[in-house]
Amino acid sequence: MFYQNFFKKFIKFFTIISLSQLLVVSSFAAGGGGDESKKMDVKSNYYYKAVKLINKKSYEAAIDNLLKAEKTNKKDADIYNYLGFSYRKMGNLDKAAQYYDKALKISPKHKGALEYQGEMFLTQGNLKKAEANLKKLKKICFLGCKEEKMLKESIMKYNKGQKSSY
């Protein structure tokens, strides 16, 4: 009898612990990884087309689509982040800076914008600002994230006189 009660209590305890861990893990998964302004926002077709164009390095066409997407949602940090990225890749750092600032004003912990802005700072020769962005990413990504890794790698390359691949 003692063992049956003990076993039932053990199973109940184990089930509760397992479920609570599952809830914690799923909440991290739901909020982790991406840099989306709001996970539930529906992106426009222009946004998705722009992302495809960016992946093909067609930055001018991507900018056209992102500007159209912006008209439907002026509070989407992802749109501004990709505008900053596209302008940076085209060499227009002034425009890139404006869009990274907009993205970070909307979402100060936007990992993608912090990483890409850090890359821009390195291009401008501003190591201190890039390191400040890396420090912010380390706080946001306490378990590590790809954006932190990428910026850290770029800073190491910068310190060796090498160019970043991002």
Q: What are the roles of these predicted feature ranges?
A:
Residues 76, 110, 144-145:
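Residue-level recognition of tetratricopeptide repeat
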